Amino acid sequence: MSDDRFAEDEIIQQRRKRRLEILKKYQQTGNGHSDLSIPEKKLKEDVDQVSTTKPIEAVPKMKTNASKIEINKEGSNSNTKLDVTNSTTSDSPSIKSSVQIEDTEDDMFADSPSPSVKRQNTGKGISTLTRSFADMQDNWDDIEGYYKVVLMEELDSRYIVQSNLGKGMFSTVVSALDRNRNQTFAIKIIRNNEVMYKEGLKEVSILERLQAADREGKQHIIHYERHFMHKNHLCMVFEMLSLNLRDILKKFGRNVGLSIKAVRLYAYQMFMALDLLKQCNVIHSDIKPDNMLVNEKRNILKICDLGSASDASENEITPYLVSRFYRAPEIILGFPYSCPIDTWSVGCSLYELYTGQILFPGRTNNQMLRYMMECKGKFSHKMLKRSQFLNDHFDADFNFIQIDHDPITNQETRKPVKFSKPTKDIRSRLKEVPTSTDEEFIIRQELMDLLEKCLELNPEKRVPPEVALKHPFFIKK
């Protein structure tokens, strides 16, 4: 059996090869770079066909009392910015770890574009990304189907492109000024091929379901405006939020984390979003700090990028769903999964926000399982027996098989490792984070308990979002 890392790389290469084959096919048939937009009526029909779930009634509001954390007071009506800085933050500069760099290399929500898409100054004050429209005729896409962004181009007869925000696996994201409303929006431009188009329609369908259930926009999912076609690309318009939690961590809590009150505020809003997702029967499937945006005052959080989201009934078993550091154990093991995978991702994200460190920085799925058992103890035999990928990581006696790669012999090494009790549990790790007041110490104890419940190895025992919202961690002291 090959190392997980090489297996994952091979899968990624195969996907890239398939994408190139699809693009070549469309170039040959003349569909790959068509300047003709799909009519809006046809687009709506396509979205309706993709939707597999009937509209649901609005989600009932969470009942809170005066003793709960004052989200509204610290929310959009506040005139002051949230102080997210950890009072124990060191002033000394630090270097980003290699695992953090690797995880954000090709992420559209990282703090800056990857080196391959960064703009360069020409010396004349004009970005090299600005191109002549005459040069772009019949050549609007690159070889992989990404739209070639043109600054000051008009989209859908109303949006003026202001800047290129970044590029991900499925799309390019730009900021654009809406002339009709004199307001800036983020526009997600899906890659030009049939597979990406259908995935984009699926995302539109899910976004519309979520908005139908949250008409007042209080459940902390990114606000979706509308969609349209441009040069054969599906485009989705979203509210503009310029910062994500990765940015916040780098700026205010690099390697030391944020203040526990900031973590508490963000955590409550995360679980509000999870509650909406669960009631709509939607799995986000890619929750991480990069995919949680905040406003300028840093007191409102919204979960974004539902490109990997799906209906809970479509949970196909695959070992590489969700970004690796935030990947729940049931995904790696091939155990039936549902909405609790998002709760696991939130737990990992909250630990990272408070400590400034990635909780499970495994470079392979096998390493991820080892780190999880060091933190939470061994998996139950009952859970392992129901896992499709059991033999990839455990022997016949349910002993974990640690897989490493010998750099000298270039061979895979395998050795059994027995786990019983946790050796690096959540509580012992968080105790290393200093507290400045008795109040902060008490709140930290409650955070420990909440994280333990979010990170249950068995998803059936993991805390549901509606229960998490009532946890003592959110009771105002």
From Swiss-Prot:
Record PTM Phosphoserine, positions in chain: S92
Can you give the residue ranges of the Protein kinase domain? Answer: 159-477
What CDD domains does UniProt report for this protein, alphabetically?
STKc_PRP4 (cd14135)
InterPro entries registered for this protein in UniProt: Kinase-like_dom_sf, Prot_kinase_dom, Protein_kinase_ATP_BS, Ser/Thr_kinase_AS, Ser_Thr_dual-spec_kinase, STKc_PRP4
Positions that bind ATP: L165, G166, K167, G168, M169, F170, S171, T172, V173, K188
Enzyme Commission number(s): 2.7.11.1
Question: Which Cys-Cys disulphide bridges does the record give?
Answer: none
Q: Does the keyword Phosphoprotein apply?
A: yes
Here the segments flagged for biased composition (Basic and acidic residues) are: 38-47
PROSITE patterns, per the entry = PROTEIN_KINASE_ATP, PROTEIN_KINASE_DOM, PROTEIN_KINASE_ST
Annotated GO biological processes are: mRNA cis splicing, via spliceosome; positive regulation of mRNA cis splicing, via spliceosome; signaling
Tell me what reaction this enzyme catalyses.
Answer: L-seryl-[protein] + ATP = O-phospho-L-seryl-[protein] + ADP + H(+); L-threonyl-[protein] + ATP = O-phospho-L-threonyl-[protein] + ADP + H(+)
* Active-site feature positions: D286 (proton acceptor)
Entry function: Has a role in pre-mRNA splicing and is essential for growth. Phosphorylates srp1.
Which family does the similarity line name? Belongs to the protein kinase superfamily. CMGC Ser/Thr protein kinase family.
This chain belongs to which protein, by name?
Serine/threonine-protein kinase prp4
Q: What is the lineage of its organism?
A: Eukaryota, Fungi, Dikarya, Ascomycota, Taphrinomycotina
